[in-house]
Amino acid sequence: MMGYEEKVSATGKTRLKILACLIVLILAAAITMLTLEIISNQKRTTTDLEAVTVALKHVSTSLANCTESTTSVHTANPRKNKESRKKIEGKSPSWVQALTTASGIILLFCIMMIFITCSWTTEKDTEKSEVQSYASSVETLDSLNEAIIPKTEMNV
């Protein structure tokens, strides 16, 4: 029975390999998340700069059009305001959000697996120590029995 358990259970080296792979996955997911956040922030910054540029152009054209009739200025404003609102909102693309979410899920999965692998290690270590302590206590009892009752008297 003990031979079967040794074949089925992972060795210490295998556990270390699993932990190393999980740590590499964590680093990859974290780097991916940081990169995606940087990309989305750059996109927002670019969008903000474009919105400011559009607003400045709108102001300059409004000042130039002051000499024209007020109806033409009012009809031009709603279109430009809608364009500037769209650019100001500037949400990050959906693929960036999807990749960030996927990276977060991978990160959480890796952290859970590290905890599980570490608990396997501690369980196996405690089982080994319990078996060793049991064996040493049996040896101690045998030696005490021999000291108290010599073998010649036990055979009688």
From Swiss-Prot:
Keywords: Host membrane, Membrane, Transmembrane, Transmembrane helix
Cellular localization per UniProt: Host membrane
Chain coiled-coil ranges: none
Topology of this chain in the membrane: Multi-pass membrane protein
Top-level taxon of the source organism: Viruses
Any one annotated GO CC term: membrane
Principal place of residence: host cell
Membrane-spanning segments: 18-38, 98-118
Protein name stated in the entry: Protein U91
Natural source organism: Human herpesvirus 6B (strain Z29) (HHV-6 variant B)
Gene name per UniProt: U91
